[in-house]
Swiss-Prot record:
Matching HAMAP family: Ribosomal_uL4_B (MF_01328_B)
PANTHER family named in the record: 50S RIBOSOMAL PROTEIN L4, LARGE RIBOSOMAL SUBUNIT PROTEIN UL4M
Keywords attached to this entry: Ribonucleoprotein, Ribosomal protein, RNA-binding, rRNA-binding
Quaternary structure (record): Part of the 50S ribosomal subunit.
Superkingdom assignment: Bacteria
Name of the protein in question: Large ribosomal subunit protein uL4
Organism encoding this protein: Moorella thermoacetica (strain ATCC 39073 / JCM 9320)
Amino acid sequence: MPRVALYNIQGQQVGEVDLDDSVFGGEVNEAVLHDAVVMQLASRRRGTAATRGWADVSGGGRKPWRQKGTGRARAGSIRSPLWRGGAVIFGPQPRDYGYRLPKKVRRLALRSALASKVRDGNIIVLDELKMEKPRTKDMAHILKNLNAENKALVVTATREPNVELSARNLPGVRFLTSDGINVYDLLAHDKLVITKDAVARVQEVLA
């Protein structure tokens, strides 16, 4: 069972926390992590690329010139894909690129991402994280105390509006609740700063 230090917002160690081995102590499955990241990025694609087909190009109802006798190549419509400004055959159309991996695979990927943070020593557990008012400077100071000022993912058990607003303007810092924790954000940020209550919520869902 992994055991990590418990810190306060001043960066002082105030205890230790035992993490659930089935959630934070498993093997890191890189293939599953890759599949999960590709799935998330595919779901974010806009899918708005579009070309005009035969039915979409304006004009072309009349034959441009008679079939024979002009010396030119025969033509039936200015909408032909051979013509400049004509139709595009089998071109892209608006579509949804999103898809879903099986639930067991998604959970395995999330457990692998969390285990990678523990393995690399990039998880910081806080006793609590609350702010009386939103202030970016205060949030930057807290992260500096924790040696997590660059590319940190901040996770709390419930929505903390003041924490969220304070973290929003810091480059490389992202705020999530434990319900929104995901593989892409875990891998995209160097440090995971998570409260003790959020750890309990994550373990409750994934254990």
